[in-house]
Amino acid sequence: MKLKNKIIKTAVMVVAVCGITFAFQTNTYAKKNFKVTPSKVEKQSKKSFRTITTKYTKHYLGLNAFLDKMEKAGGGTLTIKKGTYYISNAIYVPSNTKVVLENGVVFKKINKTGTNYKASGSMWQICPRSKSKKRIV
């Protein structure tokens, strides 16, 4: 009888420990890595934000679209290749994300959006867009 109780208690403990382990387990995804050019960023902007992409917002929206994918994947590396990128609003960089600028990358801050919302004063925010207080897009 004592042996049977001991086996039952041990089984209950094993189940409890396994349950706690699964309860605190976080989803781990493969981190995303992207290499982008101005034209690739523009295409991503049109794909992700078709209705609000303008000639003024195409680069900021496209970069944010790539960074949103990286946030969902738990981070990664965004390599920005040579070219000029026009930025009207903030680019949000999520946790566990590295942004690499190759030689010849130029960011130009512009104050037009071509839409009914205003351009922001900042170019970079070190937090994910999903956690930003004031969310325009």
Model-assigned labels for residue ranges:
Residues 3-10, 14, 18-137:
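Extracellular/periplasmic carbohydrate-active domains that bind, remodel
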